[in-house]
A protein has these predicted regions:
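Short, flexible helix/strand-to-coil boundary loops that buttress conserved ligand/catalytic motifs
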Residues: 68, 77-80
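Short S/T/G/P-rich N-terminal loop/turn motif that feeds into the first structured element of a domain
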Residues: 1-52, 59-69, 85, 89-93
Length: 93
């Protein structure tokens, strides 16, 4: 199994409708071959601003690498660059 977790710190000037659309895009990119679990949502803790979490589990590292190289992921990553900064945690278990 391979785990991929991302925390997106959304920029303060991003509108709520734009953020909602981005969350929908992030949710959709998890519907892919090799993804065994996929959760995306807005953190309940807003002390550091709006934070979106993405928590994905993949069958293995090969499945993750294929997903990451795919066009849907690249497209949503490019869009998220305009809305947020992020931290990534990836590990095998």
């Amino acid at each position: 199994m391979f785990r991929h977790v991302v925390l997106f710190r959304v920029r303060d000037d991003v509108t709520d409708p734009d953020l909602s659309a981005a969350i929908d895009e992030l949710r959709a990119v998890g519907d892919a071959l090799g993804v065994t679990s996929w959760r995306v949502g807005l953190s309940l803790d807003k002390r550091k601003g709006r934070v979106v979490f993405e928590d994905g589990t993949f069958a293995d590292r090969v499945a993750f690498e294929a997903w990451r190289a795919g066009e849907p992921h690249r497209r949503v990553a490019q869009h998220m660059e305009t809305l947020a900064d992020w931290l990534v945690g990836d590990w095998e278990h």
